[in-house]
């Protein structure tokens, strides 16, 4: 180990930065966030330093490097564009036994600055020892995606509860189980982020009052339309914390590969017109697993609240008193249209967009008169089997027969395929496409030839 990682308490302690440019500004920002009493010495300063000085946040000393400024310092940073000056700062600090960082010169420095993930009071520092700053930055970005944004607030709140936890739970094992449930409780984290004191208190009391073995919850997560890169950061965090993942056919293999390795997986294989597991049984699976104390993720393609029957599943949980939360996903209409070069709205062609199910309950009927209106875009989910009917009804209610249409198969994935034509061809085009597929109807489809960026198919 070439360097010892430490965290410095700099609040109200004198620190010095030599340099007044962009690099020095970035270092100063970190020092100010840490509460340092900061002096900045340079020949010239970029405007941000003057702003900070006018606000009383730091002291500026204009002129050549003055090593007497180090006499009362705990820490120093040399951040000029002059290697000779930087070395003078380092030597002067070394003679006073003051730690000094020299920007872009780790061998001349007595400490190096890591890449930082700040979830105060939780801090994560990543360093390559100065050998590969880009690698450290890339690793930091990866860790940023794994750590929830609200983690700091949860950590602070945990500190307030430590005494109560110690008093209520006698053994280390019980305390560990409590904290494990506490830190993965998404509703608590969201309530803290919203400063919703009532919800925070209610969730906290439930955590303390229920037996440790029966604190399961369900999180509905939208997996997006296919491309794993479209899974949200919060969605990724949830599937990596799950004890069990209940998923269906629209969730891609690439996304399932991101699920925690030791999590149980339950495939329920839904698609339009075919359910490998009936919806009521899915509801009961979620309920049963949560009642066992498990953290259950219900992973759905697209967005769980847009033709995903997420509301029905949550009603079952709500009736049983099971805690739940929802992580939205990019819905198929948004993802497939973007990856097909078809804007859903456009000032010249469409002032509104309608998301329509093509899979109605028996006896159901759509409002075809309004659907056939001009200056809008229609997106039909689960509409392949009804494509001929959609074509017939829209024309019958006045939509122009030459209205452009597109069918997007396996949208946003490497298997994406788009077929397009006009409304009179819709039923025929549907025969060329397999599920999962989306139907887009509107003048905006005509822009695809210019705006298609993702594939030639």
From Swiss-Prot:
Family (UniProt): In the N-terminal section; belongs to the precorrin-2 dehydrogenase / sirohydrochlorin ferrochelatase family. In the C-terminal section; belongs to the precorrin methyltransferase family.
UniProt KW keywords: Cobalamin biosynthesis, Lyase, Methyltransferase, Multifunctional enzyme, NAD, Oxidoreductase, Phosphoprotein, Porphyrin biosynthesis, S-adenosyl-L-methionine, Transferase
EC number: 2.1.1.107, 1.3.1.76, 4.99.1.4
Region feature (Uroporphyrinogen-III C-methyltransferase): 216-457
Name of this chain's protein: Siroheme synthase
Function: Then it catalyzes the NAD-dependent ring dehydrogenation of precorrin-2 to yield sirohydrochlorin. Finally, it catalyzes the ferrochelation of sirohydrochlorin to yield siroheme.
InterPro entries to which the protein is assigned, alphabetical: 4pyrrol_Mease (IPR000878), 4pyrrol_Methylase_sf (IPR035996), 4pyrrole_Mease_sub1 (IPR014777), 4pyrrole_Mease_sub2 (IPR014776), CobA/CysG_C (IPR006366), NAD(P)-bd_dom_sf (IPR036291), Siro_Cobalamin_biosynth (IPR050161), Sirohaem_synt_dimer_dom_sf (IPR037115)
């Amino acid at each position: 180990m070439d360097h010892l990682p430490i965290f410095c308490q700099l609040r109200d302690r004198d620190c010095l930065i030599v340099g007044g440019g962009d690099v020095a500004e970035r270092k100063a920002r970190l020092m100010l966030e840490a509460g340092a009493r900061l002096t900045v010495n340079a020949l010239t300063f970029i405007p941000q330093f003057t702003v900070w000085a006018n606000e009383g946040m730091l002291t500026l000393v204009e002129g050549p490097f003055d090593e007497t400024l180090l006499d009362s310092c705990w820490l120093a940073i040399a951040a000029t564009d002059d290697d000779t000056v930087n070395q003078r700062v380092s030597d002067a600090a070394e003679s006073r036994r003051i730690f000094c960082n020299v920007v872009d010169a780790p061998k001349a420095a007595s400490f190096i600055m890591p890449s930082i993930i700040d979830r105060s009071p939780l801090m994560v520092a990543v360093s390559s020892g100065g050998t590969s700053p880009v690698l450290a930055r890339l690793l930091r970005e990866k860790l940023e995606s794994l750590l929830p944004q609200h983690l700091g607030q949860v950590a602070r709140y945990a500190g307030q509860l430590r005494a109560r936890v110690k008093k209520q739970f006698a053994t280390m094992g019980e305390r560990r189980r409590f904290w494990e449930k506490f830190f993965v409780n998404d509703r608590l984290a969201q309530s803290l982020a919203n400063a919703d004191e009532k919800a925070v208190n209610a969730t906290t009391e439930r955590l303390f009052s229920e037996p440790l073995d029966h604190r399961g919850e369900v999180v509905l997560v939208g997996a997006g339309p296919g491309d794993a890169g479209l899974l949200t950061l919060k969605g990724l965090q949830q599937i990596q914390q799950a004890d069990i993942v209940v998923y269906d056919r629209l969730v891609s293999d690439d996304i399932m590969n991101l699920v925690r390795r030791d999590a149980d997986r339950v495939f329920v294989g839904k698609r339009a017109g075919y359910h490998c597991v009936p919806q009521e049984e899915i509801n009961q699976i979620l309920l049963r697993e949560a009642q066992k104390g498990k953290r259950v993720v219900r992973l759905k393609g697209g967005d769980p609240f847009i033709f995903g029957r997420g509301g029905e599943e949550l009603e079952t949980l709500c009736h049983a008193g099971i805690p739940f939360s929802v992580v939205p996903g990019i819905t198929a209409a948004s993802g497939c249209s973007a990856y097909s070069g078809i804007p859903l709205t456009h000032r010249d062609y469409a002032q509104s967009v309608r998301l329509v199910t093509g899979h109605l309950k028996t006896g159901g009927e759509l409002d075809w008169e309004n659907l056939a209106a001009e200056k809008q875009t229609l997106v039909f989910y689960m509409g392949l089997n009804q494509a001929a009917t959609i074509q017939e009804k829209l024309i019958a209610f006045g939509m122009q027969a030459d209205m452009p249409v597109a069918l997007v198969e396996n949208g946003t994935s490497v298997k994406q395929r788009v077929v397009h034509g006009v409304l009179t061809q819709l039923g025929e085009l549907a025969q060329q496409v397999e599920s999962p597929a989306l139907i887009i109807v509107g003048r905006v489809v005509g822009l695809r030839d210019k705006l298609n960026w993702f594939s030639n198919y």
